[in-house]
């Protein structure tokens, strides 16, 4: 390196390569079954692929509108009305983004100012905190305790201050596989009603909810939705994570600020994919309606196949992840255990501690069951040797 080379001072000095990238690379190196990263090993709907090819062939290959293709925004509005009893305005309240992660980043950047405090529920998805920190915000954390990972509303209330700007929630919850209930949203509203606090609701697994009462969305709460951004993901719903198309729903005033950020992050999202997704929403709504049963069968197959293992499987109410307690098997910390599991047993998992800022004393790993049945059975066969 030249003496004239400049080394930038990192804005995120405590971050390196994500654990998901590390574990997937380790799985490939050791020919392990990869249940670490959250993506399917099967393809999405044939009709969706055909519509993508159609729109490419028809020449829909230039920039889409910054806010998203009109047909897709209108289809999202109709779906939202069907599911949650609230129809957002397709022109002013729905924004299509380059995956849910961009929506989350744009929302946080639009709302959080230097010195603002943002409350997260830990364990939490790893993209929240860096986005807050890059905006000069400070993350405050409410710990969710296993095995049920329910919000502690007294602990939440204790964190509220005049500096609190935003609350980030996630339901169905990654990584715990728990879901919020209507009572949780009522408790949240009661806590913040008299304060100027926004809500960012990460609902990318909205269609993978096994709770009897179904998915509870912030959009179904008439008061909270007036100050909330709800984020969703077509990649999760249609098994097409590589397409990176998501969207967010928010009141017009909030959407206007979010769009200011979005236009300078990506400006627009893949045009033919948006058109294909609009067609899919209209032509085959049964896909998202039947998705809970589709994944419930995989969950139950995997749990039953693991019945002979010494892993203790925690309740799974939503998402395509299972948590497993390995306390009966090893005293290793969860990162070391996942490395050992990948190298010696041939199954890759994610340690739960990476989703937490504070030390995590529990021996829990996350396993993804968005896989073919043969993949799940092969993984269970290896895990049953533990």
Question: What is each of the regions a protein language model found here?
Answer:
Residues 3, 221, 225-296, 300, ...:
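Conserved core segment of the aminotransferase class I/II
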Residues 3-99, 106, 280-283:
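N-terminal small-domain helix-loop-helix segment of the aminotransferase-like
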Residues 110-132:
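Conserved PLP-anchoring active-site segment centered on the Schiff-base-forming lysine
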Residues 134-140:
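A short helix-loop-beta submotif of the ANL/AMP-binding
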Residues 144-212:
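Active-site phosphate-binding strand-loop segment of PLP-dependent enzymes
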Residues 278, 294-303, 313-326, 360:
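Conserved glycine-rich beta-strand-loop-beta hairpin in the small C-terminal domain of fold type I
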């Amino acid at each position: 390196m030249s003496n004239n080379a400049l080394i930038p001072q990192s804005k995120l000095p405590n971050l390196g390569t994500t654990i998901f990238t590390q574990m997937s690379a380790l799985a490939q190196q050791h020919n392990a079954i990869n249940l670490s990263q959250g993506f399917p090993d099967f393809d999405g709907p044939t009709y969706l692929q055909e519509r993508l090819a159609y729109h490419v062939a028809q020449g829909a290959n230039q920039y889409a509108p910054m806010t998203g293709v009109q047909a897709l925004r209108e289809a999202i509005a109709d779906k939202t009305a069907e599911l949650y009893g609230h129809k957002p305005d397709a022109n002013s309240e729905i924004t299509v983004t380059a995956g849910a992660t961009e929506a989350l980043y744009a929302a946080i950047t639009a709302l959080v100012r230097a010195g603002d405090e943002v409350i997260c529920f830990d364990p939490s998805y790893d993209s929240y905190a860096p986005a807050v920190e890059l905006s000069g915000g400070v993350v405050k954390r409410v710990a969710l305790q296993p095995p049920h990972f329910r919000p502690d509303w007294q602990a939440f209330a204790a964190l509220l201050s005049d500096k609190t700007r935003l609350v980030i929630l996630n339901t169905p919850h990654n990584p715990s596989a728990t879901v919020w209930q209507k009572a949780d949203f009522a408790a949240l509203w009661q806590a913040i009603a008299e304060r100027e606090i926004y809500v960012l609701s990460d609902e990318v697994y909205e269609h993978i909810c096994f709770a009897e009462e179904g998915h509870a969305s912030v959009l179904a709460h008439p008061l909270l939705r007036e100050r909330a951004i709800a984020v969703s993901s077509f990649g999760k719903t249609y098994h097409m994570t590589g397409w990176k198309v998501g969207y967010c729903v928010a009141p017009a005033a909030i959407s206007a600020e979010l769009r200011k950020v979005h236009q300078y992050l990506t400006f627009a999202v893949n045009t033919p994919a948006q058109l294909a997704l609009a067609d899919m929403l209209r032509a085959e709504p049964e896909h998202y309606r039947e998705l809970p049963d589709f994944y419930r069968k995989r969950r139950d197959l995997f749990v039953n196949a693991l019945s002979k293992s010494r892993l203790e499987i925690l309740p799974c109410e939503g998402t395509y992840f299972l948590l497993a307690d390995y306390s009966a098997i090893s005293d290793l910390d969860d990162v070391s255990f996942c490395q050992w599991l990948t190298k010696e047993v041939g199954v890759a998992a994610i340690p739960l501690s990476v989703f937490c800022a504070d030390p995590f004393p529990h021996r829990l790993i996350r396993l993804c069951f968005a896989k073919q049945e043969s993949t799940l059975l092969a993984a269970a066969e290896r895990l049953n040797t533990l």
